[in-house]
């Protein structure tokens, strides 16, 4: 249905890479269809933990070492993921600022600025951010995104690309019913 939604907010997991999400908007099927024909990618937002960003940025840990990997084959390091997320963001939410010391905040700001001098940095607690800082900003720039070294690999590697949903067994569903959803019963069912 046309004009059914004003905005669609896609929230990826903390260990996902933003570039493949953006590249999906640029990809065209064999029939010439593209997600960008029906939706506009407006803003890429990354949330960074002000307390732990310096530790993560200087870490040699693999994501799987912290129990957060997308599977046994996930060979990414914390710093690789952090760098890609910050480099590709239009807005970086520097979160947990009340928990961070002045030195931690200053180090976090410097890391973000070094990796992405054009990003809007929004300082927050509990990721409480004014909507106007992340919605309808017009900040996403496809031309700038296409300059990223991984853009062409992601976009033109789609022929051999296995979607993350298949690769990691991720699925979703939409629950619609006239009866009220009861989370307690659902949790009991899952157990």
Language-model features, listed with the residues they occupy:
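C-terminal accessory "lid"/substrate-recognition subdomains
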Residues: 59-191
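Nucleotide-state-sensitive switch-loop elements of NTP-binding domains
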Residues: 1-80
